[in-house]
Swiss-Prot record:
Gene name in the database record: 4CLL5
Gene3D superfamilies tied to this protein: 3.30.300.30, N-terminal domain of ligase-like
E.C. number: 6.2.1.-
Subcellular location: Peroxisome
Database matches in Pfam families: AMP-binding, AMP-binding_C
Protein name per Swiss-Prot or TrEMBL: Peroxisomal OPC-8:0-CoA ligase 1
Residues that coordinate or bind ATP: S197, S198, G199, T200, T201, K205, Q338, G339, T343, D424, R439, K530
Lineage, broadest ranks: Eukaryota, Viridiplantae, Streptophyta, Embryophyta, Tracheophyta
Record's comment describing the protein's domains: Both substrate-binding domains (SBD1 and SBD2) are involved in the substrate recognition, and are sufficient to confer the substrate specificity.
BP terms from Gene Ontology: jasmonic acid biosynthetic process; response to bacterium; response to jasmonic acid; response to wounding
One cellular component term from this protein's GO annotations in UniProt: peroxisome
Expression by tissue: Expressed at low levels in seedlings, cotyledons, leaves, hypocotyls and roots.
Function in brief: Contributes to jasmonic acid biosynthesis by initiating the beta-oxidative chain shortening of its precursors. Converts 12-oxo-phytodienoic acid (OPDA) and 3-oxo-2-(2'-pentenyl)-cyclopentane-1-octanoic acid (OPC-8:0) into OPDA-CoA and OPC-8:0-CoA, respectively. Follows a two-step reaction mechanism, wherein the carboxylate substrate first undergoes adenylation by ATP, followed by a thioesterification in the presence of CoA to yield the final CoA thioester.
Organism: Arabidopsis thaliana
SUPFAM superfamilies reported in the protein's UniProt record: Acetyl-CoA synthetase-like
Cofactor(s) in the UniProt record: Mg(2+)
């Protein structure tokens, strides 16, 4: 490949950008699951997880013993390779135990958001058909309402008035492995996780990731952080049910002995206190939290001990020059590293790995190790070169196998050569830095959560006084974007903004709520009936500046 440009990584002969990072080593053994791969990595780490609120911890020895015991119990109750197991839980030090145990058997883990309603959970259960669910006492009613007969394992020890098939995780963890379990052969190509992501068409779809995808992701994380000297302690506030949380905290960082300090949910005071209390070195977060840290820097530094912290890892959206410089000014000893990835790419895609790279303001970073990129004109399909804007396509060992039971969505997102259409409009500059210009996908990014406009539009149209509706992302400094609705009322209706917002709020998770409504006489559409969201976004943002 002599024609690859040494700066940009661009190859003229096939119009492909190649990563400038050291390629990741992938294990040659085809029969290997991600749990075995992680547990076999040599490191000097002692404590794997700490519960930030109680101080309870799991050492690496205890973690792997627990994983083995739980896997044994699951095997005894009939969980086999290819079975799907649902996990509905806030962050906890036991979340990774469940994931690693399930995957070690060749069974498939599917996670869901604790904020989801019973109806939303029921949809995922219907689609993924789990044979067992892990959850907490508090969240049990949601699963019971969604699937009455699903066997349950409770992850806490609270008493529940429950009929039916309920076990306790703590009892499973105490059990001595029998040694009689016949281990099924698990291949790298077998499915490990089924995480739900809103794709280009808007409705939530199950992303099939293989053990190889996860091993590639683990190796990318180890390559990126594993060479640092000294003990690394990561704060985990990002949700573990999400690819960012699952990739880094339930799997990736364990491979080289990091300690993970787990917060059950994000709360600024708890997070800042935990940094000092547990001497955390690294803080992964999403842009709105970083902005809050800049805005409240004086009070934060006066109140909390942040002396141990040396790195902030930011994902979800690129950071502006103002935010990056503002953070550097307020926290001069802390470096910011950024990352870009999708559920469909197992959270891997691009990153900035040094302070120098992070000074390329607005970038999503350089292509991750062993990743290839293309910029494709979304209209003509022509493959473009450096500094030309088009849809970013990615190819590499962490790209998903496809969408679960959805060939149409798979073929429109993955081409026959394994290229993933990201749905992001980007360009790659002469030094190989990726810049995200816009989202071809119409997803709304609220505080790092994905909200599909199509889902909210379908819900609005069930209201008897609404004849048409469109939902768009409305820009907001605090949360990134929030859902705004354009509504056409039935003739004679005096339906108010408040009533519409309450109507939706009752039926969706809090992050999906509509936070602004405008009434119009008609929704602009193209000849094929597709909503012209760009036109509505222009109207909304120009009106907000008046």
């Amino acid at each position: 490949m002599a024609s690859v440009n040494s700066r940009s990584g661009f190859c003229n002969s096939n119009s492909t950008f190649y990563s400038k990072r050291t390629p990741i080593p992938l294990p040659p053994n085809p029969s290997l699951d991600v749990t075995t791969f992680i547990s076999s990595q040599a490191h000097r780490g002692r404590i794997a997880f700490i519960d930030a609120s109680t101080g309870q911890n799991l050492t690496f020895t205890e973690l792997w013993r627990a994983v083995e015991s739980v896997a044994d119990c699951l095997s005894e109750i009939g969980i086999r390779k290819g079975h799907v197991v649902l996990l509905l839980s806030p962050n906890s030090i036991l979340f990774p135990v469940v994931c690693l145990s399930v995957m070690s058997l060749g069974a498939i883990i599917t996670t869901t958001n604790p904020l989801n309603t019973s109806n939303e959970i029921a949809k995922q259960i219907k689609d993924s058909n789990p044979v067992l669910a892990f959850t907490t006492s508090q969240l049990l009613p949601k699963i019971s309402a969604a699937a009455k007969k699903l066997p349950i394992v409770l992850m806490d020890e609270e008493r529940v008035d429950s009929v039916g098939d309920v076990r306790r995780l703590v009892e499973m963890m105490k059990k001595e492995p029998s040694g009689n379990r016949v281990k099924e052969r698990v291949d790298q190509d077998d499915t490990a996780t089924l995480l739900y992501s809103s794709g280009t068409t808007g409705m939530s779809k199950g992303v099939i990731s293989s053990h190889r995808n996860l091993i590639a992701m683990v190796q990318t994380i180890v390559n990126r952080f594993g060479s640092d000297d000294g003990e690394q302690r990561f704060i985990c506030t990002v949700p573990m049910f999400h690819i960012y949380g699952l990739a880094a905290f339930a799997t990736g960082l364990l491979a080289y002995g990091s300690t993970i300090i787990v917060l059950s949910k994000f709360e600024m005071h708890e997070m800042m206190s935990a940094i000092g209390k547990y001497q955390a070195t690294s803080l992964p977060l999403v842009p709105p939290i970083l902005v809050a840290m800049v805005n409240g820097a004086d009070q934060i530094k006066a109140k909390y001990d942040l002396s141990s912290m040396h790195t902030v890892l930011c994902g979800g959206a690129p950071l502006s020059k103002e935010v990056t410089e503002g953070f550097a000014e307020k926290y001069p000893t802390v470096k910011i590293l950024q990352g870009y990835g999708l559920t469909e790419s197992t959270g891997i895609g691009a990153s900035t790995d040094t302070v120098e790279e992070s000074r390329r303001y607005g970038t999503a970073g350089k292509l991750s190790a062993s990743m290839e990129g293309r910029i494709v004109d979304p209209v003509t399909g022509q493959i473009l070169g450096p500094k030309q804007t088009g849809e970013l396509w990615l190819k590499g060992p962490s790209i998903m196998k496809g969408y679960f039971s959805n060939e149409e969505a798979t073929s429109s997102t993955l081409d026959s050569e394994g290229w993933l259409r990201t749905g992001d409009l980007c360009y790659i500059d002469e030094d190989g830095f990726i810049f995200v210009v816009d989202r071809l996908k119409e997803l709304i990014k609220y505080k790092g959560y994905q909200v599909a406009p199509a889902e909210l539009e379908a819900l609005l149209l069930t209201h008897p006084e609404i004849t048409d509706a469109a939902v768009i992302p409305f820009p907001d400094k605090e949360v990134g974007q929030f859902p705004m609705a354009y509504v056409v009322r039935k003739t004679g209706s005096s339906l108010s903004e408040k009533t519409i917002m309450e109507f939706v709020a009752k039926q969706v998770a809090p992050y999906k709520r509509i936070r602004k409504v405008a009434f119009v006489s008609s929704i602009p559409k193209n000849p094929s009936g597709k909503i012209l969201r760009k036109d509505l976004i222009k109207i909304a943002t120009s009106n907000s500046k008046l």
